[in-house]
Amino acid sequence: MLETATVEPGTPAMLAGFDHARLGHDHHIVFPDLTLRISQGERIALLGRSGVGKSTLLDALRAQLGDQGAWCPQANALVPVLSAYHNIYMGRLAHFSRWQNLINLLRPNRACWQEISALAETLGLDGLLRRQVDQLSGGQQQRVAIARALYQKRPVFIGDEPVASVDPRQGARLLELINERHHTCVVALHQRELALAHFDRIIGLDDGRIIIDAPAHELTPNDLDVLYAPD
Ligand SMILES: Nc1ncnc2c1ncn2[C@@H]1O[C@H](COP(=O)(O)OP(=O)(O)OP(=O)(O)O)[C@@H](O)[C@H]1O
């Protein structure tokens, strides 16, 4: 359900939103009454305990955004028996013909290889493109998943814990890279310091509700403790 509020002149265009929406899975309602508006140019970090509904909300956003959204799922969504190159290439499968995709599977297209090599280099994956993904470390697999989303070249980056398996310094570098290439991002994270440092707006979820929705510069890590308090 999309909110149809009047947009004030000078207000960034709304990209996606929910107006008293019910979100969940089959018989399991995760958000019984969710109202949220996301505008162009926002960089949003979604925080909250495991199982609180971050992926559920990202899925609903993806459905609204369609081919505007570059999707970076958790690293285990890669195809393990294919090479890093082919997993990244899959980000743009729909852009090429079936015939081109088939040929590329056997013999990588030179232009695609060059573009993906350059992208892989910025992500510290040089030399690993031919390696099967299940022979990469967890952090390397995560960078392949990010590369695949960046290769989609879509306006909005939607990431489900894209830096969960890397150290904080590398996480910061990867988030910078994502921000450089995407004006608008919505990313689920567990690292609150990274959220405060790299995003403009923090949305904190708990118990089927948004309990924090504030500019990052107004919050401290302690303000986010409430999201992780034991039951
Ligand atoms: N396919 C599904 N069918 C039914 N319930 C589901 C399904 N996927 C998730 N859930 C439930 O919905 C709730 C929210 O799950 P979700 O995956 O959105 O949480 P999350 O915050 O992304 O968790 P995590 O940080 O562990 O990835 C959980 O209670 C989960 O068990």
Language-model features, listed with the residues they occupy:
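Q-loop/switch helix immediately C-terminal to the Walker
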Residues: L82-I103
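Conserved ABC ATPase "signature" region
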Residues: L102-L128
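Conserved ABC ATPase signature
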Residues: Q132-L136, Q140
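Hydrophobic anchor residue at the start of the ABC signature
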Residues: I146
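Catalytic Walker B motif of ABC-type/P-loop ATPase nucleotide-binding domains
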Residues: F157-D160
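H-loop/switch region of ABC-family ATPase nucleotide-binding domains
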Residues: L189-H190
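Conserved beta-strand-loop-alpha-helix hinge in the C-terminal portion
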Residues: R209-D231
